Amino acid sequence: LRYFIKTSTRANKRSTVRRLNRRFPRIHSGKKVQRQARIGVYIDQSGSVDDGMLAKFYAELNKLANLAEFTVVPFDTQVAEDKIYVWKRGQSRTFERVLTGGTCFRSPTDHCNREGFDGMIVLTDLMAPKPQACKSQRMWMTTEYYAKHPYFKTSELIVAIPD
């Protein structure tokens, strides 16, 4: 997780005369760099994901909240736009189920491409057809059982949580 967040970090650069350019001091202005990762965490709220698995997902997100701030997006066949919230760094939460239904990875991928996240973490049981390509880095998180028996093959990173 830590490596995924560090590699998904976007840098905002601006010119400044107060910070000197190391290569050409006092000739060219320097750059001020601000790095911040915009991570979208997409939680599968379908009926195939039971409450025990959701509790494990939220336990992992509590650990992830020590590293970075991220946006939590619940989905089943559609993204629940009214249930999206930002999980601040250092915050801790308990799990909540807000949707029940089937699973489709097309709508969260479209949402991630539209919102322009630097990284996409999908917490799911991988029981849906293979999604389309994503513009940002995508990582899958599931339990060990579903990691050994995925519904589709992917070259993207799959992280398994112990059962």
PLM segments and residue spans:
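Conserved beta-strand elements of the Class I
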Residues: 40-41, 121
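Short, T/G/N/S-enriched strand-turn elements that build extracellular solenoid repeat scaffolds
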Residues: 130-134
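…and closely analogous acidic/polar surface helices at protein-protein or active-site interfaces
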Residues: 37, 45-80, 87, 94, ...
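Von Willebrand factor
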Residues: 71, 80-129, 142-148, 153, ...
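Acidic, polar low-complexity linker/tail segments
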Residues: 2-40, 52, 66
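Short glycine-/polar-rich loops that comprise or flank the Walker A/P-loop
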Residues: 68, 135-137
